Regions:
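Gram-negative and organellar
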Residues: 20-397
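Cleavable N-terminal export/targeting peptides
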Residues: 1-29
Length: 397
């Protein structure tokens, strides 16, 4: 699931960190913390245009930004904003557009977790991006094309007792490509959806969950059929309760797609997976996954179904100065309806490792290495491998 004006009167106080030498941010009173930063990085990309015979390039970037959090007794408002300047050694005239974005998240709860009461979460994100490091990042294809993306989400939950709860969720997504680069166009789309969920505690640590959802889609650029579609889902599963170290939510069921006025254009199984395990204070393991319909971005008059799964690990060591991370992501996109030229199915697998060492409260050094492989059903001449390596400095407070 995926305006503000904050006025604070008073002097800014710098808080001392819990760990000596770690960045603490700027504290305004007892509730507001702002953490500004500046990233300076170099990236080597072995396959900039993600093709079978890809071209390599070197990318230099400067990214100023800030993270902020404003906390009350039972609520919090967090946000971020960033701007990225990039320079490509070989392809700057085509790829050297700047990127920028921001996001906000509001959370409120009237009671302790798993107790009778209300909880609310609101979120929004905007991004204007000139290039994507991976389709798995969820921000569209976009290679050689600028694009804009907007996400908004809301979740409301009512706990009638410590054992029974009902929730409602809503989300909106909008993706727009700026074509005209001499390459085949990509097609933007928008969608909105709702999901209702009920849960009942069947053990002290486990909830049984039942959910149903509806999504409405609109595709740009199609003249072969109606540009609107809709899908339905019914799922059941389990979720965690009354636990601090292990949190999860796993649902599976069926989904149906009506595309462009064609009823039951596709149907099949679907799933949602979200889990987090705090093994120790310094070691954390997570898993994410989902399947969903969306209009095709490659071909007008086509619909796709996406299956995605990822897992990651984070480890904090050396007095909390060094954070090591690793993740594996898999994405399968299959054509599920064609009113024109059929889109080929494709699979993407990526591995990524990274590390960030905080030298002192002012400077950190970071690096990431990633490898990505993509397979196309239409032939090996479209398959490709991609390696990216980044090293940089982060200046923070």
């Amino acid at each position: 699931m995926n305006k503000r004006s904050i006025a604070v009167i008073g002097a800014a106080a710098v808080a001392l960190g819990a760990q000596a030498g770690l960045p603490t941010g700027l504290r305004f009173g007892e509730h507001l913390t702002i953490k500004p930063y500046l990233n300076v990085a170099y990236t080597y990309d072995s396959n900039l245009d993600t093709t079978h015979h890809g071209e390599s390039d070197s990318i230099f970037s400067v990214t100023p930004g800030a993270n902020a959090e404003w906390k009350g007794d039972r609520w919090s408002l967090s946000g971020n904003a960033w701007y990225r300047y990039k320079h490509y050694a070989k392809n700057n005239s085509e790829m050297g557009e700047d990127s920028y974005g921001q996001g906000l998240t509001y959370k409120y709860s009237s009671s302790e977790p798993d107790q009778k009461g209300w909880s609310l979460m609101l979120g929004e994100r905007y991004q204007n991006i000139s290039a994507s490091d991976s389709i798995n990042s969820g921000d569209g294809r976009g290679i050689w094309r600028d694009r804009e993306r907007i996400n908004a989400s809301a979740a409301l939950e009512r706990r009638f007792s410590s054992r029974f709860h009902v929730g409602a969720m809503a989300q909106y997504d909008w993706l727009d490509y700026k074509n005209g680069s001499g390459y085949a166009p990509l097609y933007g789309w928008s969608s909105w959806g709702t999901q209702l969920e009920a849960g009942y505690a069947i053990t002290p640590w486990t909830n049984f969950l039942l959910a149903g959802g509806y999504n409405h889609y609109k595709q740009k650029g199609t003249s072969y059929t109606k540009n609107t579609s809709e899908s339905y889902t019914v799922m059941a599963g389990l979720g965690s309760r009354a636990t601090r170290r292990i949190e999860y939510r796993a649902l599976a069921g069926a989904s149906w797609l009506n595309y462009g006025g064609h009823n039951n254009a596709d149907s099949g199984w679907t799933y949602q997976l979200d889990g987090n395990w705090k093994v120790t204070r310094t070691l954390n393991v997570s898993v994410r996954g989902s399947s969903y319909y969306q209009p095709s971005e490659r071909y007008a008059g086509n619909a796709s179904k996406i299956y995605a799964l990822s897992t990651g690990v984070s480890y904090l060591t050396l007095g909390d100065h060094l954070r090591l991370t690793g993740d594996v992501m898999f994405r399968h996109e299959e054509n599920c309806y064609s009113a024109s030229r059929k889109q080929a199915d494709e699979d993407t697998l990526s591995f990524r490792i990274g590390g960030q060492y905080t030298i002192n409260r002012w400077v950190s050094v970071f690096t990431t290495l990633s490898w990505e492989r993509e397979w196309y059903q239409r032939g090996t001449s479209y398959d490709y491998d991609r390696f990216r390596g980044t090293v940089g400095l982060q200046f923070h407070y």
